[in-house]
Amino acid sequence: MSAPLTWHDVIGNEKEQPYFLDTLAYVAKERQAGKTIYPPQQDVFNAFRYTELADIKVVILGQDPYHGPNQAHGLSFSVQPGIPAPPSLVNMYKELASDIPDFQHPNHGCLISWAKQGVLLLNTVLTVERGNAHSHANLGWETFTDKVIAAINEHRSGVVFLLWGSHAQKKGYFIDANKHHVLKAPHPSPLSAHRGFFGCQHFSKANTLLEKQGIAPINWTPELPQ
């Protein structure tokens, strides 16, 4: 048996590409200029730290990190422990409460326990300037995260992709639906959740799809890290 492929194996080369180096250099320069950039530098790649390629069961695509103080920590939709759940995550909890019978509504918004179970919480853009949504769009992060999704598509099978809103759906358009499971719904933000995110039952559907493959389901009740 060969060892399972790692992130390093499939996207390690990206770190040497000019677009990637340019992106990192731009972000570093902004930080050096005194701008507040989220998430903190050590958290930018947390999605890959918590969820190795071989362990992915579910992918939840976000857009760019939260741009308020102490929120973003490198996982889409998740906030640092002790920070109230933002509106989109509140709506995710509402859907979970109606979808998963034993869901326990948490008093926090930290989704590290999902990531550790194999839910890749991936934003398509990995940094943002404080108070300025989408300020780091089109720097090069999208190229990198396209490569990440392509690597999952190619090297894994049976992964459940949850694509909420047009941004995530465009990003995931090339995922092979014969090889993976692609579930689509409107975004959970208060602007669009009532258009079909509520009632989509993606969390229970994801678990059913995993169990059909003999894979342990996700415990969707977020637990704080010990």
From Swiss-Prot:
EC numbers for this chain: 3.2.2.27
Source domain of life: Bacteria
Keyword set includes DNA damage: yes
InterPro entries: UDG_fam1, Ura-DNA_Glyclase_AS, Uracil-DNA_glycosylase-like, Uracil-DNA_glycosylase-like_sf
Catalytic activity, as annotated: Hydrolyzes single-stranded DNA or mismatched double-stranded DNA and polynucleotides, releasing free uracil
Enzyme class: hydrolase
Catalytic residues identified in the record: 64
The protein's role, per its UniProt record: Excises uracil residues from the DNA which can arise as a result of misincorporation of dUMP residues by DNA polymerase or due to deamination of cytosine.
Protein name per UniProt: Uracil-DNA glycosylase
Organism: Photorhabdus laumondii subsp. laumondii (strain DSM 15139 / CIP 105565 / TT01) (Photorhabdus luminescens subsp. laumondii)
